[in-house]
Design a protein with these regions (language model features):
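Phosphate/nucleotide-binding beta-alpha loop and adjacent structural elements of enzyme active sites
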Residues: 1-314
Length: 314
């Protein structure tokens, strides 16, 4: 797997990849980012082919998203200043001293965290705020979405509740990036195995850990990647493969297509275009220079042999 060649490694943009995607895909790619504090980061230039929705209920963070959107230079996103929850209605948001730890679930007592993993009071509740929330099922109905190609969840413990609020629509989601915990940081928080089990019942398989946190070799949390095991719709399958390639999971994309009887040439066309786009110019220049040096050395070697032959013959 060429993991690590992701959207941030660019050199020449995604021009070839975009062109191939436009040829092969039924567009748009539908992405929903739940907990978009700091902005939507996954898409880069591929955002031009996407319909992106971003949820951020915390007022200060939502204002930052709006300002960034108005200033330009970032992908156009449909911003939603609301929360996603298992049920539509009013929910309490616990805003913590570290704003990014805010959650619909109440943090466990500070003594629990301090005694084990933290040296601050970052999980202390600074404010309680009543916010409007919508269920995933209601959201897709209101937005008239028949599918979600990529769902990202980072809501500090309420991810499984959000998924359960999607009901049978979960089967219409192709790829999920979901933050999970391995220890309870919030009251009543489901952990990794429960998330995996629930998603498996809707046809998903876990395929990768991404970034996460460890303390003294103990994993506390991680972003986890899930994908539907079987696709019956060719257009949906192709969008999933493109997403996998775009975020660096080349081998997953290859076997996804092969397992669904898609000619390997399709994968090669997509992967080659992506790799060509993200190979930095300096590497291309070095490769060209290295090739020229090899030719020069080869030529010099031939000349040396010729000189020795002529000398011995004379």
């Amino acid at each position: 797997m060429f993991k690590g060649l992701d959207a941030s490694n660019g050199g020449g943009g995604n021009k070839r990849f975009l062109s191939v995607c436009q040829d092969l895909l039924e567009l748009p790619i539908v992405s929903v980012d739940v907990g978009a504090d700091g902005g939507v980061r996954e898409w880069g230039e591929l955002a031009a082919l996407c319909e992106i929705h971003a949820f951020e209920p915390r007022p200060d963070s939502f204002d930052d998203l709006q300002k960034a959107q108005n200033e330009g230079g970032r992908p156009k996103v449909k911003l939603h200043n609301t929360g996603l929850a298992r049920a539509t209605g009013q929910h309490r948001l616990y805003i913590t001293r570290i704003p990014q730890a805010s959650s619909l679930l109440k943090p466990k007592p500070a003594s629990f965290l301090l005694k084990r993993w933290r040296q601050d009071n970052g999980f202390d509740v600074a404010q309680e705020l009543e916010i409007n929330c919508i269920s995933l099922a209601r959201f897709v109905q209101e937005q008239q979405l028949s599918r979600i190609d990529f769902l990202k969840l980072d809501t500090q413990g309420s991810e499984l509740d959000i998924l359960r609020g999607g009901g049978d629509f979960l089967r219409e989601i192709s790829i999920i990036k979901c933050e999970v915990e391995f220890v309870q940081l919030y009251e009543g928080q489901p952990l990794f195995d429960e998330v995996v089990g629930t998603l498996a019942s809707y046809g998903f398989r876990f395929f990768a850990f991404e970034e996460g946190a460890e303390v003294y070799k103990k994993r506390i949390w991680s972003d986890c990647m899930f994908i539907q095991s079987k696709f019956t719709d060719q257009a949906r399958l192709m969008r999933a493969a493109v997403i996998l390639i775009h975020i660096g999971y080349y081998e997953e994309a290859l076997w996804l297509l092969v397992d669904h009887d898609v000619p390997v040439e399709i994968y090669q066309r997509l992967a080659n275009a992506r790799l060509e786009d993200i190979t930095p110019t300096r590497i291309k220049l070095w490769q060209g220079f290295r090739g020229s040096v090899r030719k020069l050395l080869k030529t010099a070697g031939v000349l040396q042999v010729a000189k020795k032959f002529l000398k011995s013959a004379g």
